[in-house]
Amino acid sequence: MKNIGVRIRGIYATALTKYLVDKGYRICHVSGKIASRLKIPQDQSSPDVDVKHNFDRQGISVVGAEESLSRLIDDLRGDFIDIVTIPSRVELYGLYKGKNFRGKVDLGGVYGFMEDEGGGEVELLVQVAEIKNVPLLSRNITFSGDYVILIPQGGIKISKNIKDRRDRTHLFELGRKLSVPNNYGVLWRTASMTAPDDLLRQEVEKLSGELKDLFERYKGSSVGMLRPGKRHVSIIFGSDTKKKLDFIRNNLIPTSTNHHKLKSGGKDIALALAVYEEILRKHHIVDDFEGMIRGLLGPKERNLIRIEHVKLDGRVINLGEARIAYFSHPDMTLERKVYGNGVYDGLDVQKDNGDKIVTEVQEKSWYIVHKYYSPQGRYKGSYYNICTPVEFYPTKIRYIDLEIDVVKTDRVKIIDREALGQRVADKLISERLAEKAVAKAEELAEELS
């Protein structure tokens, strides 16, 4: 038994809760619906790790203390092959002295962003309020403990998860008796509901002292972190991981094929899917929700579609729009025109204005191929991009680039093998995923030779 408490929210909650329960984790603040499905007890203690879906729904953000977070990530990487783990270089909710210039704030070699308040380059105290690929900063400084948060406005607030009127009244009265720094108030967290009053008083006193000390230290400090927050790691899910989570969820409740992929496609599709699965739960019908979405929204031949190329460091590279020349699920052919001159990276052949790129892709394939032609139709070469299984959405195709590639011109060669090895050393991907990518590259190279 790990005795690590995890709070899970978002579109992956049901499947991840089941997975983590089976791995021996303790689930905190579980929703009533999921508690009923899994028959797990309510636990209102403070979680060691917080999990919620990323802002783009293509994975999860995990936040917590180093040891608990590392154990959770090790379990996920051991059981799901195509995940990428990207640690943030700043700590979520951490307090920093920064140097602001037009909304871009130097936190000590790492940059965060906030609304530009003008006035040129100035030093200020900021907090990492959110991380969406980049740190988003706020000047509204909060101080968090296990049971209470000191908030930069007066008054007493209580977590909406504390429902009992007697508990709320008791916490409100307790808050009125406590002394906090000027212009600050108290927000009681859910875990305060079951904690003894003495412990709550001690935490408020401790946080108040730390807050006063921080404002004093800030004046003479250099740019950098003044108070730690929580470690933040973004975990990107590939297609295989979503399919495995579908399987876990389907063993609990009726789940449409490609449920988590569809959920990650946007709120409108997610809402329609919820209605569809309610019907699926009550009636015996053929499950083809994704086919209906394709028929209504695409992709469709002659339409434009985006190519979303996700790097292992989390950057999303938009390769531009391509025309769908052919589509019969799961096969698709795209065409793009080249503007500008130069040299094609990897192929080392001339790039000319007016060249045509023909991209052939199959959903769930571990590679995507780009074929290059001159304006007159002369073949120049092919670039086989090894990636996580490709996903089709109505307006885009998506995959995670696995660094290693195969190129074919007058000869066939594998490139960037060393770059993939470095990603394993950096712990962005597992050894197992790297081995899968290398095996696919070697298989393709042999077929093409």
Please identify what each model-predicted range represents.
Residues I317-E321, N353-G354, S365-V369, Y399-E403:
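Short, surface-exposed coil-to-beta transition loops
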Residues G346-T395:
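Phosphate/ribose-recognition catalytic cores of enzymes acting on nucleotide-derived substrates
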Residues R398-E447:
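A hydrophobic, small-residue-rich beta->alpha segment in the mid-to-C-terminal subdomain
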Residues P152-G154, F327-P330, S374-G377, K408-R411:
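Short acidic-glycine loop/turn motifs at beta-strand connectors
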Residues L262-Y344:
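Charge-rich, low-complexity N-terminal segments
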Residues V275-L296, V361-S382, E443:
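Short, compositionally biased leader-like segments
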Residues F101-M114, D331:
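OB-fold (S1/OB) nucleic-acid-binding surfaces
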Residues K2-G94, G98-N100, E115-H283:
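OB-fold/S1-family RNA-binding modules
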